[in-house]
Amino acid sequence: MSNYGNAFFSSESKQYPASVMPVWLEVKRRKIAGGTFSLSGVAKGTIFPAGLPVRLDKMGGTVTLLPTFTVVGAVSSSATTLVLRPQAGIIPAEGMIVGKMTSAGVVAKAAALGTPTALSGSDAGKYQFTITANDFGTLADGDILVIASAAGANKAAALPNGLSWRQVVVDSDNATYGSIAVVTDGQILGDRIPAMPDFYKEAIPGIEFEYEL
């Protein structure tokens, strides 16, 4: 595992897989010891970007990564497929329970995902899932899904209490865990980090989000 600088942005149009593209404008306070997280099943070359929402239980303890996933294309209540674009280098796994978080922090219509099918060509980086009709109700293109606490539950598995300070690159097939320092107070470029629902941002009031566009 390697730590790189305060970097990384990935979107449909731009990728800087090992860049020095800055995301942090100012870091006032961080848990420098950070926490560790499991790399079980994580492929070599995976990048966990700076600015990823995380939850740290204690200094030097365990950090929970809170990846988000963007819906690609509108999804009707009768749809039986769902296409997602991972926002943080974390591919949604089979059985992962996700749902859309409302502005009130409610995760409506959470359900488990099936086996991901990687798309190719112009759709590379996106994954298609088979779903049961009305699993997620209706979703709009660009909606952000978060990990939910349980199928049918009305809340997220966890809320962030900070953002990752630097990007982490998995550079070995034998790595068992990674570590991340967590920023709790600072200023960050919100359009260079993984998209997240507004309720996530409200959960970390020490972070000020600035936008370029």
Language model features: what each stretch is:
Residues 1-213:
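Surface-exposed, low-hydrophobicity beta-strand/loop segments enriched in small/polar/acidic residues
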